[in-house]
Amino acid sequence: MITRPPIKQRLVSEQIRREIIEGQFAPGAQLPTRTELERRFAVSTITVQRALDRLAAEGFIHARGRRGTYVAENPPHLSRYGLVFAHHDSEARPWPRFWTALHNEAKRLEQSEPGREVTIFCDADPHGRSAEAQRLMRSVKAHRLAGLVFCFQPNWLSGTPALEESGVPRVAITHDSGLPGVTAIKLDTASLLDRALDVLAEQGRKRVAMVTVGSIYASAADRERFHAGLADRGMSTQPYWYQVLDVNRPQWARECLHLLMNDGQKHRPDGVIIANDNLVEHASAGLIAAGVRVPEDASIVAHGNFPWPTPSVLPVTRLGFDAREVLRVCFDSIDAQRRGEAVEPEAERWVKVKFENELDSADIRAG
């Protein structure tokens, strides 16, 4: 149970923290002595000590014995990024594989980029009903974060410190942010579709099926783009070859692909795009059940989140997004906002699609 510090202690720590955040005490700068702080705030030695202990625990300062107390070289408001997931990963509510890739690579990034620290929050309950959500709100209000990266559209957090606290840069990995002060980090799914179709065309495929989920390529505009891309390449499809599944029930991809590709069908696709990596494993099982030989009977292009692509027992061409690049774009955007660079109210930054063979094979992790 976390208790609130006494009022005077809290006021001292808040004021010193504010002065560090505003740059009155730069990273590495020495703070006034304890005696000077006692006089300035008209408080006791123990009150000053506990206020400084609190700031040290938060990562803002550190003591050097008799040499005094100094601002940390990498204080949290400049170096600690909050990576926010909507909920915990659980059997009842499993994470999409994209979130798992981001989570895994966030901690690795700390090791490869000294001076950057990632704090992970796995509950964004706007009502603060969990300890995790309360920790998020407290960290934001105390400016213990350089900025926030939301792995989802955070509109339900309107009215909470997570979106309303001033001076906190924010980005959201989303198709459309639509929120003032939140930069949208967008994955270039349009080029993913184009490059997938290019691969199938290069392999001589003419009849293409698409299997996707409700969050991507599921709108009427997406379907029109798919048909236009096929027409541009002299390819074709059928209305019932465009299947949209529930991302939370990926196991049904097995039956879907078995139905599409079994030898009882009069016409079968010779190219399949599996547009979400949560479906890949089950879709591959469906192709095997249908007796499809890959690549003799059909070519398969599968979405993946690198460097953690979904395993497949079939030879598939993978393309998708590198979680490391996504995180770097997010953190760089936060840094730009913190430097005061102009950011439009609904600014966007894009992450480009990559083929698996465009990455170093040594970077690929077992999914």
Language-model segments: what does each one mean?
Residues 1-77:
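N-terminal helix-turn-helix DNA-binding module of bacterial transcription factors
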Residues 10-14, 22, 34, 75-139, ...:
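Amphipathic helical "hinge" segments at domain boundaries
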Residues 12, 183-211, 219-220, 225, ...:
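Hydrophobic alpha-helical segments within soluble ligand-binding/sensing domains
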Residues 15, 254, 258-367:
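Flexible loop/turn connectors
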Residues 82-84, 144-152, 209-213, 264-279, ...:
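Periplasmic-binding protein-like
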Residues 109-127, 209-210, 227-254:
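Short beta-strand elements in bilobed, periplasmic/extracellular small-molecule ligand-binding domains
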Residues 151-192, 278, 304-316:
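Flexible loop/hinge segments that line or gate small-molecule binding clefts
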Residues 196-235, 345-362:
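An alpha-beta-alpha
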